[in-house]
Amino acid sequence: MVKSPKVYIRDSGLLHTLLGIGEREQLEGHPVVGGSWEGFVIEQMLASLPNASPFFWRTQAGAELDLLLFLKGRRIGIEIKRADAPTMTPSMVSAVNDLELHRLLVIYPGSTRYRLGHKVEVMSLPESIAELA
């Protein structure tokens, strides 16, 4: 594991204001759109799961997990994607195996829920919060 901080701007409205982004169309075409989505998801999860202990995980080899939650005695991995149909990545496989995750949730802006593999499931932000709360 690598010990280094990762900076999130958890208030996406503040981020958008600082960058002069006033409309959704501006955001969609801006390079910060992925980071904005990631920060928004993390803020919503932490606000909805006050008993969770949150961490960021990254290895020397570059595998990373956007959010690692210790919740109700379980290790839950959260990977945040803006893609329409996220697929399994080597980082996800590493996280499931190395961290011995109970499960890994891939959060995306879509609404179709589906499995990617053993312990790995793609779902919407509202579904993930409802399941973990």
Residue ranges and their predicted role:
Residues 9, 56, 79, 106, ...:
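Structural signal for conserved beta-strand scaffold positions within catalytic alpha/beta enzyme cores
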Residues 47, 94-102:
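Arginine/glycine-rich "motif VI" loop of SF2 helicases in the C-terminal RecA-like domain
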Residues 53, 103, 119-121:
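Conserved beta-strand segments of alpha/beta enzyme cores
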